[in-house]
Amino acid sequence: MEESRQLESSIDRLLNEEKQMRLAENVAGTRKAATEILKLCFEAKDWKLLNEQILNLSKKRGQLKQAVQSMVQQAMQYIDQTLDIETRIELIKTLNNVAAGKIYVEIERARLTKMLAKIKEEQGLIAEAADLMQEVAVETFGAMAKTEKIAFILEQVRLCLDQKDFVRAQILSRKINPRVFDADTTKEKKKPKEGENMVEEAPADIPTLLVLKRIYYELMIRYYSHNNEYIEICRSYKAIYDIPSVKENPEQWIPVLRKICWFLALAPHDPMQSSLLNATLEDKKLSEIPDFKMLLKQIVTMEVIQWTSLWNKYKDEFENEKNMIGGSLGDKAGEDLKLRIIEHNILVVSKYYSRITFKRLAELLCLTTEEAEKHLSEMVVSKALIAKIDRPSGIICFQIVKDSNEILNSWATNLEKLLDLVEKSCHQIHKETMVHKVALRA
């Protein structure tokens, strides 16, 4: 009782002092009095009184911004020293209420929200944690450090992926420009001029830009895996592979390079896939995993690949991927790999044949005629090649795929020939007309 009375009298004395300083607009004095009140409540372990005093002081008429900021920052130091989760949540919510709508404590509010979301996640309330995080738009915070902003947005993306909200995860991920990870951190930062906003330094627990780069691409791999976007997964692994810390450690770059090779094999044939495939084959480190170099060479070489022999050779490596960094290649990966080999073989056949029977095509692809027709039709629809099927005679006619320049040149040449022909015809008509006119006069 004696201690309680003593605490009340000390707080009353400090409240009077705080009022005098506040009315006199004495920033240092107001800040000191307010923080001293919070300190007394904390030392007495009276958490309820602490919450009350934080709210009361923040609502005082004409309360100075600096005093509110100091109170919030000081009270945040007490969060980890609370006795139980309920008390911790209550204190965080109190500080969040004080910080709401105040631009000068927006960074503190973001950090408090992150703490609360972490507690909710530990309690198994992932949806609630995700909703809390999405309430804060850190990309608009000018004073927040770049790395802290990125870390916050990545946490938002991760929580969305954890609750299978892939649409929102994509929207949030677009707030981060991948080029930001390639910024030169060795350059000296310009000192801000007087009057400019000072950017706060990121807390010690925020990872470096290169660590954030890896986290970002690992999250993007999770997102792209949902729709089996193999070429985008491959590009994400390529970005991880280019991180210096990964390239220097064989235990890290070998599994990543293996993943790049597998996803190149799984990706549909297009200019992006061809470019990445050739760039990977030029990598000297690929020779340290010869089986995968052979796999990529087989895909690049315009020769028919026997699926059975390829699968027997790489089946163990394929299934072993689930024990590597990044986990398995996906549920449909085995089927998609077979499909890519069939597509590769059809492209090879279209290069060497202008006409071929269905029966012969099916033999080369080791498929039935119905399956061969189905895969060929899908490739024609996707414009991977040009072919015409004569079903009654069972013959396929392949045509060379022309690029836009060739088509334009061909059209211009044909138009020139047509105009020449029209001009010659005009000359002939004119000549005949002149001859007949002379004959009539005679």
From Swiss-Prot:
PROSITE patterns the record matches: PCI (PS50250)
Tissue expression notes: Ubiquitous with highest expression in flowers.
Any matching Pfam family: PSMD12-CSN4_N
Assembly with partners or alone: Component of the 19S regulatory particle (RP/PA700) lid subcomplex of the 26S proteasome. The 26S proteasome is composed of a core protease (CP), known as the 20S proteasome, capped at one or both ends by the 19S regulatory particle (RP/PA700). The RP/PA700 complex is composed of at least 17 different subunits in two subcomplexes, the base and the lid, which form the portions proximal and distal to the 20S proteolytic core, respectively.
Similarity section: Belongs to the proteasome subunit p55 family.
Gene Ontology BP annotations: protein catabolic process
Domain PCI: start-end pairs: 232-403
UniProt KW keywords: Coiled coil, Cytoplasm, Nucleus, Proteasome
GO cellular component, one term: cytoplasm
SMART domains according to UniProt: PINT (SM00088)
Keyword Nucleotidyltransferase: no
Function: Acts as a regulatory subunit of the 26 proteasome which is involved in the ATP-dependent degradation of ubiquitinated proteins. Acts redundantly with RPN5A.
InterPro entries linked: PCI_dom, PSMD12-CSN4-like_N, PSMD12/CSN4, RPN5_C, WH-like_DNA-bd_sf, WH_DNA-bd_sf
Protein name: 26S proteasome non-ATPase regulatory subunit 12 homolog B
Disruption phenotype: No visible phenotype.
Location of this chain's protein in the cell: Cytoplasm; Nucleus
Gene, per the UniProt record: RPN5B
Coiled coil start-end: 1-129
